[in-house]
């Protein structure tokens, strides 16, 4: 699947819950529905699950990305959409594209050129109940959990130049280490 969104540093996606405790009214598992209508948040979900599925292991998201800037970031949240409609984040990962190949040798994007990107969402163990949906949110910000970035090669928290990035991507795969109940 291919989608496009625009990231604007002056209007970052707000952090809703999660594993940070400072500066947030709510932390821990918080419903993500308030951010789903944003044009810079893309939401994918499965059909309702006919049986429970347990996911246990390390979660990675493989994307093919492009941008009209030399750097941008991706944030992905693996969530459960409950039968009630609540969307709860189970694990989250983020990566500034500059570091997609190496932390020690940053490499800019070539504007308009496709590049593979793997987002590590970390280890998790959870059971998605029958009737729920596996869902995925993709965006470029999660403030204040991660610092907004300028879409340039500048150091974090440096905003001498700010570029709005238009970012197409294709979701290649989200391999889930799953146990499907029979």
Segments the model singles out, each with a brief description of its role:
Residues 1-182:
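C-terminal, loop-rich substrate-recognition/catalytic regions characterized by aromatic stacking residues
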């Amino acid at each position: 699947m291919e989608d496009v969104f625009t990231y604007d540093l002056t209007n970052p996606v707000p952090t809703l819950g999660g594993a940070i405790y400072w500066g947030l009214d709510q932390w821990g598992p918080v419903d993500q529905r308030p951010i789903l209508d944003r044009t810079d948040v893309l939401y994918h979900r499965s059909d309702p699950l006919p049986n429970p599925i347990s996911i246990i292991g390390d979660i990675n998201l493989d994307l093919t990305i492009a941008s009209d800037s030399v750097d941008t970031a991706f944030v992905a949240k693996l969530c459960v959409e409950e039968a009630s409609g609540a969307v709860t984040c189970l694990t989250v990962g983020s990566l500034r594209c500059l570091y997609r190949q190496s932390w020690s040798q940053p490499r800019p994007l070539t504007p308009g050129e496709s590049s593979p990107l793997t987002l590590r969402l970390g280890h998790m163990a959870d059971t998605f109940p029958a009737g729920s949906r596996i869902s995925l949110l993709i965006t470029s910000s999660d403030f204040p959990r991660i610092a907004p970035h300028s879409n340039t090669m500048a150091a974090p928290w440096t905003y001498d130049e700010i570029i709005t990035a238009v970012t197409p991507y294709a979701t290649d795969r989200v391999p889930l280490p799953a146990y499907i109940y029979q």
